[in-house]
């Protein structure tokens, strides 16, 4: 009776699950990834009425990867798993999203609150009555945990979790017990959108930091801009572009920052990754007397084995929660507001010429013929074939490093997992990215993945077919785990894999007529395929077996692998 009275007092009653899903729709999510399980089934019934499409992945790990890829294109995503077995299958993907600042709302269907209070010995538990253990595991890779156990707190917990996910650009964890799915809460709150705006900087503090930045910038003789992943994740790309335009400064990207700036812009200078950079880029960045570093993540793979040669004394770091000018750090101040004011007050700065970049093939590399396809030839060639606004996904390994040599057309979105580096990630991410692209108007989605990595997650090709997605998948066939070979065990059998008939796999997954597979082994084969207009714009999934020599790898991969091997000794 108490529940009935409480419900009658609500002005606009709404079920908890509906409230949650309508909030997801409000922030731009249109598809939800995950795997059904008995503790989330009742909640899934609410998706259609809330305008959300259920993707239905092959396993939870892949679903997490897909949610990551969807978020990188769409801005935010949602993942639904079931208690224990499902959420722990996904936690690797969630950890990757946490490390790389990708916003995923992870919703976990839980047993009835009564069962939890009584410590019942239910399936999917550890058998010890502890129903909080999995939430504790997820807390370390989530920016907030919202447990929807009390109707009086549910709406606030949901709204706060989604806001934190958006603002901090990291996963959040929400538990939804089976009995809470249909509980009534006040729905009038849905009339007020969640406030997704950044907290304003303290004006006095912000102005002071801006003045300090400008003092050093105006004094510098050879300043440059270096853009990295957190500029993308924390949504300052417009500010980066405006600074690039207003200042005329040479602008470079770190590997994780690929796609952050227009690579056709006259000020774009290339990829800086320490010793992994080309000579002209390395010289200009390392001889600079002031580096405006925006959103840096200075990890091993992002710096070609920690080979950056730029000192903090010549660096101004802009981040989402602080700005560091040389050795002085200013906490609790976000870079977005600071960058805007720097642009407004910029004035004249000393801008050096930018090195000319192109996708020209190396002079000493045979341009065509019946020769094997090499990395030195392939990655610049890809730059000639890509189109504006493509989505380019590269797997950890040869593709991740090879793409550094590709100059993108305007508007390209680059997706990779350079920091977390979970092999197989890119296949699931491709599914999520392709779905987000379809929702936005069918931008091309192109995946480059190794024959070793694809064997971990290839089931998501089935999900691509099921959801009528049309990515172009290049499988680099080079007989195993190349990056591992360069780190340790060149001839070791543990770096070998079983050879598969990759181009036949989509047929096994039910692709039917809406699929085409290719096998290319020479440069002439590749050139002919790139000239094929149907291949460039087919409305269905395509897979290319791309054969490369076993011992071949991008030079930056070799350098980084050597550094990793030395640290492991």
Swiss-Prot record:
Keywords for this protein: Decarboxylase, Lyase, Magnesium, Metal-binding, Thiamine pyrophosphate
This protein's record includes keyword Metal-binding: yes
GO biological process, one term: glycolytic fermentation to ethanol
GO molecular function, one term: pyruvate decarboxylase activity
SUPFAM superfamilies hit by this protein: DHS-like NAD/FAD-binding domain, Thiamin diphosphate-binding fold (THDP-binding)
Catalytic activity: a 2-oxocarboxylate + H(+) = an aldehyde + CO2; pyruvate + H(+) = acetaldehyde + CO2
Binding site for Mg(2+): 451, 478, 480
Entries under InterPro entries matching the protein: DHS-like_NAD/FAD-binding_dom, PDC/IPDC-like, THDP-binding, Thiamin_PyroP_enz_cen_dom, Thiamin_PyroP_enz_TPP-bd_dom, TPP_enzyme_TPP-bd, TPP_PDC_IPDC, TPP_PYR_PDC_IPDC-like
Cofactor detail note: Binds 1 Mg(2+) per subunit. Binds 1 thiamine pyrophosphate per subunit.
A GO cellular component annotation in the UniProt record: nucleus
Keyword Lyase: yes
Residues annotated for pyruvate binding in this entry: 38, 124, 484
Binding site for thiamine diphosphate: 398, 421-423, 452-453, 478-483
Cofactor(s) listed in the protein's UniProt record: Mg(2+); thiamine diphosphate
Pfam families, sorted: TPP_enzyme_C (PF02775), TPP_enzyme_M (PF00205), TPP_enzyme_N (PF02776)
Record-listed E.C. numbers: 4.1.1.1
Family label: Belongs to the TPP enzyme family.
Subunit structure: Homotetramer.
Protein name listed in UniProt: Pyruvate decarboxylase
């Amino acid at each position: 009776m108490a529940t009935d009275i409480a419900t009658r007092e609500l002005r606009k009653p709404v079920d908890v699950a509906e409230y949650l899903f309508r909030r997801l729709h409000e922030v731009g999510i249109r598809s939800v990834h995950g795997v059904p399980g008995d503790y989330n089934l009742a909640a899934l019934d609410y998706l259609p009425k809330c305008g959300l499409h259920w993707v239905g992945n092959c396993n939870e790990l892949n679903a997490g990867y897909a949610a990551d890829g969807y978020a990188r294109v769409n801005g935010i995503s949602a993942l639904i798993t079931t208690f224990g077995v499902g959420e722990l299958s996904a936690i690797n993907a969630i950890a990757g999203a946490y490390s790389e600042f990708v916003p995923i709302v992870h919703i976990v269907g839980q047993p009835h609150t009564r069962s939890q209070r009584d410590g019942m010995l239910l399936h999917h538990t550890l058998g010890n009555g502890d129903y909080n253990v999995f939430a504790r595991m997820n807390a370390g890779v989530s920016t907030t945990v919202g447990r929807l156990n009390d109707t009086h707190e549910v709406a606030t917990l949901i709204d706060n979790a989604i806001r934190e996910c958006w603002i901090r650009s990291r996963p959040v964890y929400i538990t939804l017990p089976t009995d809470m799915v249909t509980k009534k809460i006040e729905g009038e709150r849905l009339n007020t959108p969640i406030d997704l705006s950044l907290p304003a900087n303290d004006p006095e503090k912000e102005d002071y930091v801006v003045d300090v930045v400008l003092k050093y910038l105006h004094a510098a003789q050879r300043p440059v801009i270096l853009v990295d992943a957190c500029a993308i994740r924390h949504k300052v790309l417009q500010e980066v572009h405006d600074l690039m335009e207003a200042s005329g400064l040479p602008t470079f990207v770190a590997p994780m920052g690929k796609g952050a700036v227009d690579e056709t812009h006259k000020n774009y200078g290339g990829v800086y990754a320490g010793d992994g950079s080309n000579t002209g880029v390395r010289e200009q960045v390392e001889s600079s007397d002031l580096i405006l570093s925006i959103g840096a993540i200075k990890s091993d793979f992002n710096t070609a084995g920690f080979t950056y040669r730029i000192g903090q004394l010549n660096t101004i770091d802009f981040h989402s929660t602080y700005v560091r000018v040389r050795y002085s750090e200013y906490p609790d101040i976000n870079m977005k507001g600071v960058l805007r004011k720097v642009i407004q007050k910029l004035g004249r700065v000393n801008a050096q010429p930018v090195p000319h970049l192109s996708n020209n093939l190396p002079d000493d590399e045979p341009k065509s013929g019946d020769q094997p396809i090499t990395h030195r030839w392939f990655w610049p060639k890809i730059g000639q074939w890509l189109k504006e606004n493509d989505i380019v996904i590269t797997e950890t390994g040869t593709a991740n490093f090879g793409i550094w040599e590709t100059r993108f057309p305007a508007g390209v979105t680059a997706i990779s997992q350079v920091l977390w580096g979970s092999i197989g990630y890119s296949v699931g991410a491709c599914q999520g990215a392709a779905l987000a692209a379809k929702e936005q108007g069918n931008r091309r989605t192109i995946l480059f993945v190794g024959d070793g990595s694809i064997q971990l997650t290839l089931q998501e090709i089935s999900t691509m077919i099921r959801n009528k997605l049309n990515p172009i998948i290049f499988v680099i066939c080079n007989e195993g785990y190349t990056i591992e070979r360069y780190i340790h065990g060149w001839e070791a059998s543990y770096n070998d894999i079983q050879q598969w008939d990759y181009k036949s796999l989509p047929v096994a997954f039910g692709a039917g007529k809406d699929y085409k597979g290719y096998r290319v082994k020479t440069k002439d084969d590749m050139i002919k395929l790139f000239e094929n207009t149907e291949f460039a714009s087919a409305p269905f999934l395509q897979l290319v077996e791309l054969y490369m020599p076993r011992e071949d790898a991008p030079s930056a991969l070799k350098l980084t692998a050597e550094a990793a091997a030395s640290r492991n000794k």
